[in-house]
Amino acid sequence: MRLCSFTLPGELPDMLRAGVVEGPLVFELKKRTSIMAIIQSGVAPNSLETDTGGHELDNVLLGPPVQRPLKILATIVNTQGMLGGKDVMLDRPRLDMKAPSTVVGPGAGIHVPGSGIRPEVELAMYVGRRLSAATTAQAEAGIFGYTVLNDVTAPADSREDAYEAYRRDRATGEIRKTLLRGPLFRSKNHDGFCPMGPWVVTSDENDWSDLKMTTKFGDLLVQDGSTSEYIFSPAKIASYVSKFLTLEPGDVVSCGSVGWTSEALGELDPTEFVLPMKEGTLELEIEGVGRLTNPLVVGRQ
């Protein structure tokens, strides 16, 4: 089942309705509610009743499935393409946080800072049950559904936020001044840096384990990979997080991105990659989940 949040023409953006997407139509739920309320209530999605008359998807404005998740955890690296080498392995997920207020929906403009941005297509899960010290099986059963998340990043911010500190050299044991990479928080938390959508696909709908993931910017293929590249499954990530931080219904956990294409990178190091500084439309797609499109806004706020 595909559940979406939407408004009709002329309605305010925050007056979101909840509906079920079937083909080219969206059917509003009979009971006025939100996807967040549905997730938190624990009601079975297939028990939801809809109106008989549907709206054409092209005639509604889709919002993010959940306008303000309780918290958003983003897996930083979960594929070899993001690690930069096949000889690198991880023993556990690495994560960061995105502010819930950075969430926007399909079609919302992404304002590009002067240093540029890069997109990161990610499969994101909505947590459907309270998870605390959960096993992988318990975490799997606690996933409500999946959506597409763009973990927009301004990499220059973390370079600017680098700082020096005294650290012990692992090889020599000597304590010396070391330049440390800056935190990722600022680079990932500008307003609008977390587009999500176009809807949430309930976890019973399909198998997440081998879904094609792509990002396009106009005619440029920026990312091309698959969820089969994930080192840690969504359930393993959720289980790991729940060992130290309780996950609540309505939380979002994003599972990581894939590497950038050689066509997009050119001669750039992956850590330096940003999109060309021009306006255009980003199109992120995960097979079986959906296509998320957002225009880039350059040079104006």
Model-derived features with residue positions:
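N-terminal non-catalytic cap/leader segment that marks the start of a structured domain
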Residues: 1-94, 100-101, 114, 214, ...
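Residue-level structural signal for beta-strand termini and adjacent loop
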Residues: 32, 227-228, 298
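Residue "hotspots" at secondary-structure boundaries inside conserved domains
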Residues: 64-65, 71, 115-117, 239, ...
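A conserved acidic, glycine/proline-rich C-terminal tail/linker
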Residues: 233-277
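A short, charged
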Residues: 43-64, 68, 162, 170-180, ...
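Glycine-enriched loop-and-adjacent helix/strand subsegments that border the catalytic/binding cleft
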Residues: 72-229, 233-237
